[in-house]
Curated annotation (Swiss-Prot):
Its EC number is 3.6.5.-. It holds the Pfam family EFG_C. The lineage of its organism: Eukaryota, Fungi, Dikarya, Ascomycota, Saccharomycotina. Keywords: GTP-binding, Hydrolase, Membrane, Mitochondrion, Mitochondrion inner membrane, Nucleotide-binding, Protein biosynthesis, Transit peptide. It comes from the Eukaryota. This is Translation factor GUF1, mitochondrial. Belongs to the TRAFAC class translation factor GTPase superfamily. Classic translation factor GTPase family. LepA subfamily. Residues 43-226 form the tr-type G domain. It comes from Zygosaccharomyces rouxii (strain ATCC 2623 / CBS 732 / NBRC 1130 / NCYC 568 / NRRL Y-229). The keyword DNA-binding does not apply. It catalyses: GTP + H2O = GDP + phosphate + H(+).
Length: 643
């Protein structure tokens, strides 16, 4: 059951490699690479990826493999194929994600052509993993000997298993003093039913056993690709990125046939036609070999104008031979699941910022962007993200780059409104939430998105974590003791809306950092959610409204009015701050009018002047009042939202 769910969940990755160009390689070097590939039969191709929980050593192991096969020079911890860390730190991406290697296996006296695809283990980028799986015959399931099986290990296992990949269990970090190899092997056998005898023990750091045991296992256990050279050419579009010199670059897996530079191809999904300008392998940079054939994973430069024409999962075919070519099953398009509003702060121009925001989004194909207008904050944008991590990474990036220039609202998830007349509406903005009258008369049910969360943790934190999940409206579905040593796996159905509220941070803090989390969409469920609004002198500030479960409304409402009061300076008239849900006021705070003492400097005798001044003050008040809540400095909104 989980396996089928796993297939359903498919995401785009959200960063683009900036690939160094390899035309620097001497033509003779490229010729010899070409010759070497030509001499290797498809039976000697091995396409695989490494899957693991974050920090279990994927990138380090990739480095060792690239060194041992002579792709890169040995020495140092380079993480040549790593991107997520850099992405997190600097919001940029530096390296290609896939690499071709040549390996001469002395046992057989033969050359092998190996494609390694490194994958980020994080949940929001699961699509990355599944897409790379689609071009692989197998995967190394890497487990840190000092940590054992963790949440992403489990989730990635299900995905790989569901895609029929041959899995090689690998225990890493056996050089560590506190490595508990026996325990890790136990967990792998108990959790995944992969026999202990099949496990390979390595140290990616020192390289121990990588050459001796791991490379031979890759050759012996991972099956070669199954395509057919004589069939019409077809390729699966696995990934794409934008290169400022050559434009759109596609990473493709050649399923059948052969394709060459200059060939004309067409896309099954868009029907558009292209002529291949450049073609080759990632080694580790773009290395133009002029040809790719069945079973290989490589790149093509199609002279494509827009990145959005590169549909992940698309099939490329030879122009004119579409009728005889079977289109590949492809992938499901990912849908944004977390949304925020962004608005220019005081004094910033929408127009100028619009270009910036659009540019930022352009680099990240998986972000959706729409115009939006707010009563308090004016014209802005609505941004959609794949998941809560994706949203927070991007939001951090916006804040770092546009800090004071943008006001960013609280994240929200989509809600499904089901009407009595049978139609449905998906809303991604609290502003679209049906009002009480509509709810009473027309709405049959409101649903919110749920996920199945997998958590692993040491038993001593079980109580804390269960409490946290209950507090976040979770429903326990499974509890499994991974082995005798006290590692537990918990499964909960949780509302995605709760996850967005820094659930991961809270989980880490109640487990002293030991618990790990992974999750997967499981669809929409009926829910008693309402819209909570913040009112200022009676009018609702739309950009601050939030949809939440009715059980949370009271607590959040009280906190809101209290907090907002802190940021409002006293005005010349009374300001009433209220929280309202379902047409009912939940909480209220008042800021007393500040009576500017305009009379202070006057002598008591100067009565006419005194009267005049009082009248003037009254008019001033009237003027401010007529402007109403807009008098609030936008800094206040910004401070309120930055909690
Ligand atoms: P990834 O997130 O799975 O790509 O993990 P990394 O390759 O970035 O490794 C995470 C951390 O573990 C880094 O600090 C590595 O240096 C360290 N590491 C990886 N493999 C080993 C190993 O075999 N032994 C030891 N002691 N540390 C390792
Ligand atoms: Mg890594």
């Amino acid at each position: 059951m989980l396996a089928s769910q796993a297939i359903k969940r498919i995401f785009h990755r959200s960063w683009k490699p900036l690939v160094r160009f390899n035309h620097g390689k001497a033509p003779t070097a490229i010729e010899s690479i070409k010759k070497r590939i030509e001499d290797i039969p498809i039976e000697n191709y091995r396409n695989f990826s490494i899957v693991a929980h974050i920090d279990h050593g994927k990138s380090t192991l990739s480095d060792r493999l690239l060194e041992l096969t002579g792709v890169i020079q040995s020495g140092g911890n380079k993480q040549v194929l790593d991107r997520l860390e850099v992405e997190r730190e600097r919001g940029i991406t530096v390296k290609a994600q896939t690499c071709t290697m040549f390996y001469h296996d002395k046992r057989y006296g033969k050359d092998f052509l190996i494609h390694l695809v490194d994958t980020p283990g994080h949940v929001d980028f699961r699509g990355e993993v599944s897409r790379s799986y689609a071009s692989c015959g197998g995967a190394l399931l890497l487990v840190d000997a000092s940590q054992g099986v963790q949440a992403q290990t489990v989730a990635n296992f299900y995905l790989a298993y569901s895609m029929n990949l041959k899995l090689i269990p690998v225990i890493n970090k056996i050089d560590l003093d506190h490595a508990d190899i026996a325990q890790a092997e136990d967990q792998i056998e108990n959790t995944f039913e992969l026999p202990k005898e099949d496990t390979i023990r390595v140290s990616a750091k020192t390289g121990l056993n990588v050459k001796e045991d791991l490379l031979p296992a890759i050759i012996d256990r991972i099956p070669p690709p199954t395509g057919c050279l004589d069939k019409p050419f077809r390729a699966l579009l696995v990934d794409s990125w934008y290169d400022s010199y050559v434009g759109v670059v596609l990473l493709v897996h050649i399923v059948d046939g052969t394709v060459r530079k200059g060939d004309k191809v067409s896309s099954a999904q868009t029907g558009k036609k292209y002529e291949i300008k450049e073609i080759g392998i990632m080694f580790p940079d773009r290395t133009p070999t002029g040809i790719l054939s069945t079973g290989q994973v490589g790149y093509v430069v199609p002279g494509m104008k827009a990145s959005k024409d590169a549909k992940i999962g698309d099939t490329l075919m030879h122009l004119g031979r579409e009728q005889e070519t079977e289109v590949l099953p492809g992938f499901e398009e990912p849908k944004p699941m977390v949304f925020v509003g962004a608005f220019p702060s005081d004094g910033e121009e929408f127009k100028a910022l619009n270009d910036d925001v659009n540019r930022l989004v352009l680099n990240d194909r998986s972000v959706s962007l729409k115009r939006e207008t707010s009563n308090a904050l004016g014209q802005g944008w609505r941004l959609g993200f794949l998941g809560s991590l994706h949203a927070s990474v991007f939001r951090e990036r916006l804040e770092n780059e546009y800090g004071s220039k943008l006001i960013i609202t609280q994240p929200t998830v989509p809600y499904m409104i089901k009407y009595y007349d049978g139609h449905e509406r998906l809303i991604t903005n609290p502003d679209e939430f049906p009002d009480l009258a509509e709810r009473r008369n027309k709405v049959q049910a409101i649903q919110e998105p749920y996920v199945e969360a997998i958590m692993t943790l040491p038993q001593e934190y079980l109580g804390n974590v269960i409490k946290l999940c209950d507090h976040n409206r979770g429903q326990q579905t499974e509890i499994t003791y991974l082995n005798m040593t006290g590692q537990v796996m918990l499964k909960y159905d949780l509302p995605l809306g709760q996850l967005v509220e820094d659930f991961f941070g809270k989980l880490k803090s109640v487990s002293r950092g030991y618990a790990s989390l992974d999750y997967e969409d499981i669809g929409y469920r009926d829910s008693d959610v309402v819209k909570l609004e913040l009112l200022i002198n009676g009018s609702s500030v739309d950009a601050l409204a939030q949809v939440m479960h009715s059980s949370q409304v009271e607590r959040v409402g009280r906190a809101w009015v209290k907090k907002f009061k802190e940021y409002i300076k006293a005005q010349l008239f009374e300001v009433v701050i209220q929280a309202r849900a379902n047409s009912k006021i939940i909480a209220r705070e008042t800021i007393k009018a500040k009576r500017k003492d305009v009379l202070q400097k006057l002598h008591a005798s100067d009565i006419s002047r005194r009267k005049k001044l009082l009248v003037k003050q009254k008019e001033g008040k009237k003027h401010l009042k007529s402007v109403g809540n807009v008098q609030i400095n936008q800094d206040a909104y910004q401070a309120f939202l930055r909690r």
